[in-house]
């Protein structure tokens, strides 16, 4: 009998020992068990943080804006805003400036408002929005915003300049029993000594003084402006004109001559000098001056008006008519051009056309006594004596012009109303005695009429 193997297990069913599958054994935790440490991970590379500078393209944007290349500038602005999610303050600011220069004022205000929000509500942007509101005609809102801007921009003369311009457009009204004068208020703002550093501001101050009748203040302002900008031909013109208005002809010619020295083709200076020459009956020299101005500034109604007067003085009515018609086409609302056309048509015996232009002149400027007097002359040429007499009386009522009064005296003499003619002639003599300037031709005509009016009295005495 063979010995049995003790390692052999006899039987069909095998009962596994718990130690055969150790993974399935869950030991009961004890207080002495310590959790195993976590597995060590390989160190990862540090993350790279990219710092975005939203102002990196500002230099290129300002470069295109300064050059006036708005297309490229707007392209750069679009790139900046799309890349930095519209968080660039300078881009909105420059875009607003471009929109304002292009006349898109509402878009400009929207851009300035966004820049204002991004800047932490910087009050300096009230200056930009105030200018937009001024251009839109919202003067009250413009004054409020520019006043806020002046609190942080006290040394910027442009803020005060635009504030004065906005106040200048206010209506004159009574406030608490006092009359509010916008021109006086605007001048008061610009009279501050610490802001008188800008030529444009001082030039506007001179215009305000001139409007208020302060001639000496206007001259002083224009001189100060010339010290800041010695080559400013516009200020030279204004100073020359105010010298001429005050009777300082020599000083006026000096300023106009300086203007032509800087700009020989300056149409405004040439027009002023030419008109003075025409007043002294030097029409040929004036026309030569106008020829230079016409080459540079052909589309100038006042220039062609003066050319027409010069040609009429040289007895060229057809050429004068062409020049005056061109002047009327360029500037149809200038009453002086309509007046000259009326006088020209009356000289050419075209009385209906003359009456049409003189009537247009009186509609443009109803209180023009000279035009009403010219209408009376034309009506008398048309044998409308009743309306001519009414026009003469209306003209004398508006202003006692020596030429109109003398024409009325001659008209009444022709109508055989000696009494009315004598009264009109007496009124003319009184004006002449009071120092009113009368031409030598008018004086000679008045003396002749006086001698004629005395003849019926002498024959009645005999």
From Swiss-Prot:
Keywords tagged on the record: Cell membrane, Cell projection, Cilium, Cilium biogenesis/degradation, Cytoplasm, Cytoskeleton, Membrane, Protein transport, Repeat, TPR repeat, Transport
PROSITE patterns: TPR (PS50005), TPR_REGION (PS50293)
SUPFAM superfamilies for the chain: TPR-like
An example Gene Ontology CC term for this record: cilium
Annotated knockout phenotype: Single mutants do not display any obvious defects in ciliogenesis. Double bbs-4 and bbs-5 mutants display a defect in cilia structure and function. This is characterized by an increased accumulation and mislocalization of intraflagellar transport proteins and impaired movement of intraflagellar transport proteins along the ciliary axoneme. Double mutants also have defective polycystin-mediated cilia signaling and mislocalized and increased accumulation of mechanosensory receptors pkd-2, osm-9 and odr-10 within cilia.
Localization per Swiss-Prot or TrEMBL: Cytoplasm, Cytoskeleton, Microtubule organizing center, Centrosome; Cytoplasm, Cytoskeleton; Cell projection, Cilium membrane
Assembly and binders: Part of BBSome complex, that contains at least bbs-1, bbs-2, bbs-4, bbs-5, osm-12, bbs-8/ttc-8 and bbs-9. Interacts (via C-terminus) with bbs-5; the interaction is direct.
UniProt protein name: BBSome complex member bbs-4
């Amino acid at each position: 009998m063979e010995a049995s193997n003790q390692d052999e297990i006899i039987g069909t069913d095998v009962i596994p020992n718990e130690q055969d599958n150790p993974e399935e054994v869950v030991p009961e935790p004890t207080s002495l068990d310590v959790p195993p440490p976590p597995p060590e991970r390989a160190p990862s590379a540090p993350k790279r943080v990219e710092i975005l500078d939203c102002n990196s393209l500002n230099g290129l944007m300002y470069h295109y804006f300064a050059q006036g290349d708005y297309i490229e500038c707007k392209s750069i602005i679009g790139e900046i805003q799309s890349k930095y999610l519209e968080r660039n303050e300078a881009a909105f600011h420059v875009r607003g400036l471009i929109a304002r220069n292009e006349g898109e004022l509402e878009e400009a205000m929207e851009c300035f408002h966004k820049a204002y929000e991004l800047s932490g509500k910087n009050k300096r942007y009230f200056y930009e929005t105030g200018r937009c509101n001024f251009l839109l005609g919202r003067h009250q809102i413009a004054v409020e915003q520019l006043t806020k801007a002046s609190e942080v921009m006290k040394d910027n003369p442009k803020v005060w300049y635009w504030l004065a311009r906005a106040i200048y457009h206010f209506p004159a009204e009574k406030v608490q029993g006092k009359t509010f004068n916008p021109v006086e208020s605007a001048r008061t703002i610009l009279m501050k000594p610490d802001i008188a550093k800008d030529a444009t501001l001082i030039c506007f101050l001179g215009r305000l003084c001139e409007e208020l009748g302060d001639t000496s203040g206007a001259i002083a302002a224009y001189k100060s402006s010339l010290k800041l900008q010695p080559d400013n031909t516009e200020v030279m013109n204004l100073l020359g004109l105010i010298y001429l208005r005050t009777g300082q002809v020599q000083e006026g010619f000096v300023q106009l001559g300086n203007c032509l020295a800087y700009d020989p083709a300056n149409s405004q200076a040439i027009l002023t000098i030419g008109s003075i020459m025409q007043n002294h009956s030097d029409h040929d020299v004036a026309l030569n001056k106008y020829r230079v101005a016409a080459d540079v500034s052909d589309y100038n109604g006042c220039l062609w008006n003066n050319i027409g007067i010069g040609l009429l003085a040289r007895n060229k009515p057809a050429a004068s008519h062409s020049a005056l018609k061109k002047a009327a086409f360029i500037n149809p609302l200038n009453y002086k051009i309509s007046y000259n056309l009326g006088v020209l048509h009356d000289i050419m015996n075209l009385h209906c056309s003359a009456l049409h232009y003189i009537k247009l002149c009186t509609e443009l400027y109803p209180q023009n006594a000279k035009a009403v007097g010219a209408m009376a002359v034309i009506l008398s040429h048309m044998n409308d004596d009743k309306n001519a007499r009414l026009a003469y009386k209306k003209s004398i009522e508006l202003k006692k012009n020596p030429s109109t009064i003398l024409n009325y005296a001659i008209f009444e003499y022709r109508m055989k109303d000696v009494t009315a003619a004598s009264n009109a002639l007496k009124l003319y003599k009184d004006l002449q005695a009071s120092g009113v300037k009368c031409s030598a031709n008018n004086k000679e005509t008045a003396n002749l009429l006086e001698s004629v009016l005395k003849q019926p009295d002498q024959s009645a005495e005999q």
